[in-house]
């Protein structure tokens, strides 16, 4: 399979959206099933999770069916925290998936720090401090600041 065929396959089977949906399903199920998730990784705010397609790869293993891997990079508040791999058959059927976070101590600190920034942003916006100033103080994205402002208004 050449790269053009792989790109056509990717578009034909709506793989990007299916992989993104698969990530959210996996994460939601993990959060529900693992009572220690928030303790291990902190209370993640889904608004701060971003996904980026990193790789699409055709794989041929002898004595096994060919398959295609799609790797999504996971970012939390613009910091890389892990990857999500979804595996598909050549017919475009879901085969398997796995979510892998990097060092959970780093993620927990990042999540807690970000949550503190969100609390500061909420308080600052309630006091009438302009969005741009809150963005500079907290390091949060302008879209999140606007979302917080709508929530508290």
Give the label of every model feature segment.
Residues 2-4, 110, 150-153:
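Short acidic DE-rich linear segments
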Residues 114-153:
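Elongated, amphipathic alpha-helical interaction scaffolds
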Residues 53-59, 112-119:
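Short, positively charged, low-complexity/disordered linker segments
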Residues 1-39:
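N-terminal trafficking/processing presequences and adjacent post-cleavage segments
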Residues 24-27, 97, 122, 126-129:
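Charged, amphipathic alpha-helical interaction segments
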Residues 81-113:
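A short, surface-exposed interaction/processing loop segment used at functional sites
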Residues 42-86:
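Exposed beta-strand-loop-beta-strand "reactive/processing" segments of non-cytosolic proteins
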